[in-house]
């Protein structure tokens, strides 16, 4: 007689699976609530305390933590001395363990959950049984996922439970218990940067490929999902999101979260292409499109208001990969869904992104930092020039600062209030970004109102000089260079407003 031990929190699929095991000749052993469910279904089941000859105790905290259980799991069937020892102590081998764990994750997601409630939902016996079974996978089938029940039954019936399949189930167990423990560790940890960093993610999607066709890829969600994420967006129309789609859409969502005003953000290769605001969404679109009507092709568009028909008509004429918005009117959806390859996503928008750790892979490890969520406000500005800013210039500088923090360094943004005019991204030296952004901006309507924002300080006064000589009248930068005095002097010489924000926004 082969023996299966079942102890599950998630009862889905349990009864038909258990009945199949009985038909296959398994003797069932179970614990607590699982035992009751199986008995109520009319199955013959041995209670765990009949196996251990010891009652459950401490409010169920101790049920399966017993040598008669773990010896039955860990004994190697290919070692005569192991089997002899089981016989000596009259221990029956256990050939299958079916366990899923206390719902710690769903418990800590409940509003108002206490630490005591969370701790009571930390499973001890379940992971112990799973790990014992997984270690001895050559002899014991460890099953942690109800989705595997049908596959296991079919393989048992066909006699196809080979070593490779057993090994895959064992790997799944250790992945599951590691993720479970990581979730607990992160819940209990009170420091952002512990000595041992444990991260829990769950597969969201197998992707066609990564950044390029020769790179395999998958997407994973954090074990405790964030509501404001492209991975939680509803895909109303279009095919599966690609790796690059997800990265670009994420960049767009981060930028548009900076603004409460009606705003449209366009993104290409994770850099903003154009950003516009207006009294209506259509007007905001017009501003964003005019900001860079070339780079937008093949790009991502994020809008923080419901998409109406008028705006949809204008977007329909352009090749776009994704449009993401809180919602679409029926008319707007009909217009845009006519484009087969356009992906339409909905996601409730927010201007409050929670502070979390950002993890970046490097060869041999990761670097970890808190998100750059410093709010931009003219209250943080210090005017260091003799020239004083106008109200309109201050508003434009706040707008530009919210953009420049999302541009790859060295980053320069030329903008007027409510519209970017030129964006210089990713240049190895700052003056090149200054030159490029101004060249993009200077022939556009509204350049006479333009201000310039820099993500980091100017190491020399050449950026101030170039900007002033090409029509920029107000500049905002963090300050902090040993040559700040040179930049201030140049601004005063040329009559330019120079403001220090006090906050650097490098982005690599």
UniProtKB/Swiss-Prot annotation:
Domain MGS-like residues, every copy: 1-144
Reactions it catalyzes: (6R)-10-formyltetrahydrofolate + 5-amino-1-(5-phospho-beta-D-ribosyl)imidazole-4-carboxamide = 5-formamido-1-(5-phospho-D-ribosyl)imidazole-4-carboxamide + (6S)-5,6,7,8-tetrahydrofolate; IMP + H2O = 5-formamido-1-(5-phospho-D-ribosyl)imidazole-4-carboxamide
Pathway: Purine metabolism; IMP biosynthesis via de novo pathway; 5-formamido-1-(5-phospho-D-ribosyl)imidazole-4-carboxamide from 5-amino-1-(5-phospho-D-ribosyl)imidazole-4-carboxamide (10-formyl THF route): step 1/1; Purine metabolism; IMP biosynthesis via de novo pathway; IMP from 5-formamido-1-(5-phospho-D-ribosyl)imidazole-4-carboxamide: step 1/1
EC number in record: 2.1.2.3, 3.5.4.10
Entry's Gene Ontology BP terms: 'de novo' IMP biosynthetic process
Database matches in InterPro entries: AICAR_Tfase_dup_dom_sf (IPR024051), Cytidine_deaminase-like (IPR016193), MGS-like_dom (IPR011607), MGS-like_dom_sf (IPR036914), PurH-like (IPR002695)
The keyword Transit peptide is assigned to this record: no
Signal peptide interval: none
Keyword Flavoprotein: no
Domain of life: Bacteria
Pfam families with a match to the protein in the record: AICARFT_IMPCHas (PF01808), MGS (PF02142)
UniProt comment concerning the protein's domains: The IMP cyclohydrolase activity resides in the N-terminal region.
Protein name (record): Bifunctional purine biosynthesis protein PurH
């Amino acid at each position: 007689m082969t023996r299966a031990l079942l102890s599950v929190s998630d009862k889905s699929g349990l009864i038909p699976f258990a009945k199949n095991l009985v038909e296959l000749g398994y003797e069932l052993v179970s614990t607590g609530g699982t035992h009751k469910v199986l008995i109520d279904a009319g199955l013959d089941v041995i209670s765990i305390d009949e196996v251990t000859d010891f009652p459950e105790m401490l409010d169920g905290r101790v049920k399966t933590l017993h040598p008669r259980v773990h010896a039955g799991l860990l004994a190697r069937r290919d070692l005569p001395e192991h089997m002899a020892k089981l016989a000596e102590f009259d221990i029956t081998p256990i050939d299958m363990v079916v366990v899923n764990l206390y719902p710690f994750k769903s418990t800590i997601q409940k509003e108002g959950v206490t630490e005591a409630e969370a701790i009571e939902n930390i499973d001890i016996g379940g992971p112990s049984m799973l790990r014992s079974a997984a270690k001895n996978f050559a002899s014991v089938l460890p099953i942690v996922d109800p989705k595997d029940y049908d596959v296991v039954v079919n393989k048992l019936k066909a006699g196809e439970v080979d070593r490779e399949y057993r090994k895959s189930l064992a790997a799944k167990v250790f992945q599951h218990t590691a993720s479970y423990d990581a979730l607990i560790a992160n819940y209990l940890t009170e420091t952002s940067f512990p000595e041992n960093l444990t991260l829990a993610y769950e597969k969201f999607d197998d992707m066609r490929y990564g950044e390029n066709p020769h790179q395999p890829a998958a997407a994973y969600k954090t074990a405790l999902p964030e509501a404001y994420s492209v991975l939680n967006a509803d895909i109303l129309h279009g095919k599966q999101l690609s790796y690059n789609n997800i990265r670009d859409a994420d960049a767009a969502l981060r930028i548009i979260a900076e603004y409460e005003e009606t705003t449209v953000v366009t993104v290409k290769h994770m850099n903003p292409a154009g950003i516009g605001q207006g009294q209506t969404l259509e007007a905001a679109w017009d501003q964003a499109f005019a900001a860079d009507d070339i780079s937008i092709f093949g790009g991502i568009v994020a809008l923080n208001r419901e998409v109406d028909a008028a705006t949809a008509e204008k977007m329909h004429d352009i090749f776009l990969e994704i449009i993401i918005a809180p919602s679409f009117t029926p008319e707007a959806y009909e217009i845009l869904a006519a484009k087969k390859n356009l992906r339409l996503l909905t996601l409730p928008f927010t201007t409050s992104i929670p502070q979390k750790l950002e993890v970046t892979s490097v060869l041999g490890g990761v670097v970890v930092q808190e998100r750059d969520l410093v709010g931009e406000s003219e209250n943080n500005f210090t005017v260091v020039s003799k020239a004083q800013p106008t109200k309109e210039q201050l508003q434009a500088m706040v707008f530009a600062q919210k953009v420049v923090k999302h541009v790859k360094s060295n980053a320069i943004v030329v903008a007027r209030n409510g519209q970017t005019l030129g964006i210089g991204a990713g240049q190895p030296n700052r003056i090149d970004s200054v030159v490029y952004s101004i060249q993009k901006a200077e022939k556009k309507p509204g350049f006479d109102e333009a201000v310039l924002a820099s993500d980091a300080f100017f190491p020399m006064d050449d950026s101030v000089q170039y900007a002033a000589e090409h029509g920029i009248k107000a500049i905002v930068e963090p300050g902090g260079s040993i040559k700040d005095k040179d930049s201030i002097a140049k601004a005063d010489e040329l009559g330019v407003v120079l403001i220090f924000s006090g906050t650097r926004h490098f982005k690599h």
